A protein has these predicted regions:
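N-terminal Lys/Arg-rich, disordered targeting/topogenic segments
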Residues: 1-21
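Membrane/wall-proximal cationic-aromatic binding patches
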Residues: 32-95, 105-113
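Membrane-embedded segments
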Residues: 75, 79-159
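Secreted/periplasmic serine-hydrolase-like ester/acetyl group-modifying domain
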Residues: 142-249, 341-344
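Extended hydrophobic/aromatic segments used for targeting, binding, or gating
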Residues: 241-247, 253, 257-308
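Histidine-centered active-site loop/cap adjacent to the catalytic His
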Residues: 306-348
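Structural signature of tandem-repeat unit edges
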Residues: 363-372, 383-400, 410-424, 434-450, ...
Length: 495
């Protein structure tokens, strides 16, 4: 055998050896990952996220697991958590109800998987994901999943094994955070609506939500498009496999549409485009679509802090409509006697008196937005600065929002300060300043600052970090509905 043949054989052997090693490692991970609960029990680390919004998942999972009576299981994201009165559905249908919606950043796939813990003959499963490309895809977030599993690691057994690799990769960071908090004697204890005790036993959010808190009545970072293009084909196949599984258990699957803020609809939305959207869903989802998307579009004053989250009045309107849809699907002709509340008028948003103009106010360019301003640019003087602070007021009006192109031309900018007045930041805002590496966040509440949960920092400097002036601010953001996905960029203050 000549030298060249020897080398080729050695290479071939090396490739086979590498391939075998990869297969062995993959098999090892599949075997070891289910052992994590045992390791955690041995170490006896306390639950870290049980008071957080994600901590609610274990209660939803166990309610479903323990409910053997005939039941209605509503599977989806946070629009289900914020949009259903389960007791009202029980009253009018005679079924037990499990609200099995929580958080878009977990993804719809994991909620479908976990719901398999206890679906039986005679049950009804209503599938109601948000109308968003992320929730209508195979999206899986290992970081938020670990936080949600924190209270009950037995849920690992119901997660698709294809996601084990992502979970394993995220495990060191999760354990590091848990150990760090344990050593310091600290815990994750957020304030506001996004915490576990905002839910009742059914899994509905019962935290008081009197009116729409969004500046201008809608979230400008989240335009809603009613089109078949928002559905991922792989997700549709997975969803239809799930529907087939539900039917195999002797249960019935229905599909409905989540509530949609009329003010947030894409400008091209029309009656015809809505009908075409319905036709697409009805043709591609292998179960009865029991709702008309047009009836899911509600006026803005029925919403709370998101274009998919309802306030208390909106919950009643949405639940009554869902019961009517169920009645039609079940062949019932009963008349409903549910009093529908009027949409509550929110108070005028002006900002407190202590918000003042300062030396920063003259460095930005503004456009009118919701009785105040949004920032759309920076002056030439401001573009030359390495540090900027977003003002609270300008010309006597509150500054509410930051648009995606506001920092275009700010190549010198390295540090930016944001205070409590800002209620929305559009994706692209941070990437417009390529050298920005430090954001000082001087606010404690995260729920009133809406951002895109997946793409906010796309294109931004990879070294960018968010610094907080208080531990409660850090906690509320790192566990916050809109901000939790960016927890790895957040720096806990040293106090």
């Amino acid at each position: 055998m000549n030298t060249q043949e020897t080398m080729m054989n050695e290479k071939s052997s090396g490739v086979r050896g590498f391939s075998a090693t990869v297969k062995f490692v993959a098999l090892l991970l599949a075997v070891l990952l289910p052992l994590v609960p045992i390791v955690m029990l041995v170490v006896k680390l306390p639950s870290t996220y049980h008071e957080s919004f994600l901590g609610e998942l274990t209660y939803k999972f166990n309610r479903l697991k323990d409910t053997d009576e005939k039941k209605i299981v509503i599977v989806g994201g946070s629009s289900v958590a914020f949009g259903i009165n389960s007791e009202l559905i029980e009253q009018y249908t005679g079924y037990k109800v499990v609200n099995f919606g929580l958080y878009a950043s977990l993804g719809t796939k994991i909620m479908l998987d976990l719901s398999k813990v206890n679906i039986n003959e005679g049950d009804i499963v209503i599938i109601a994901p948000e109308l968003d490309e992320q929730t209508l895809s195979m999206y899986f977030n290992a970081e938020t999943t670990w936080q949600a599993l924190d209270c009950d690691l037995s849920m690992l057994a119901y997660i698709d094994s294809e996601n084990y690799g992502a979970l394993w990769g995220q495990l060191p960071e999760y354990l590091s955070t848990v150990m760090d908090l344990f050593i310091k004697g600290e815990k994750i204890s957020p304030t506001g609506v996004y915490r576990a005790d905002s839910f009742n036993a059914h899994g509905d959010i019962v935290y008081p939500r009197e009116y729409n808190t969004m500046t201008g009545g809608y979230d400008p970072t989240q335009t809603i498009t009613l089109s078949g293009e928002i559905y991922d084909e792989e997700f549709l196949a997975y969803l239809n496999d799930y529907i087939a599984w539900v039917e195999k258990q002797g249960a019935t699957a229905y599909y409905t549409f989540c509530p949609v803020n009329e003010a947030a609809l894409h400008e091209d939305t029309s009656e015809e485009s809505i009908r075409e959207f319905y036709r697409y869903v009805a043709e591609n989802v292998n179960c009865a679509v029991i709702s008309d998307p047009a009836s899911s579009i509600l006026e803005q004053n029925y919403f709370y802090d998101s274009n998919f989250h309802l306030n208390d009045a909106g919950v009643t309107v949405r639940t009554a409509a869902l019961i009517e849809d169920l009645y039609r699907a079940m062949g019932r002709t009963d008349l409903l006697s549910i009093k529908l509340p009027a949409a509550p008028e929110p108070p005028k948003q002006e900002g407190p008196e202590y918000w003042e103009e300062n030396e920063w106010s003259s460095l930005f360019i503004y456009e009118d937005f919701a009785d105040g301003y949004k920032i759309v640019g920076v002056t030439e003087e401001g573009k030359a600065m390495e540090s900027l602070e977003i003002p609270m007021k300008a010309d006597g009006k509150a500054v509410w929002s930051l648009t995606k192109d506001a920092l275009v031309g700010c190549d010198a900018l390295k540090e930016l300060t944001i205070r409590e007045n800002i209620t929305a930041i559009e994706s692209g805002f941070f990437s417009a300043a390529p050298n920005l590496v430090r954001v000082n966040m001087y606010r404690t509440e995260a729920e009133n600052l809406t951002v895109d949960q997946a793409n906010l920092f796309d294109g931004a400097n990879s070294a960018l970090k968010i610094y907080f002036d208080s531990s409660i601010g850090y906690t509320n953001f790192v566990t916050g509905y809109f901000w939790a996905n960016y927890g790895g960029m957040m720096v806990r203050p040293e106090e």
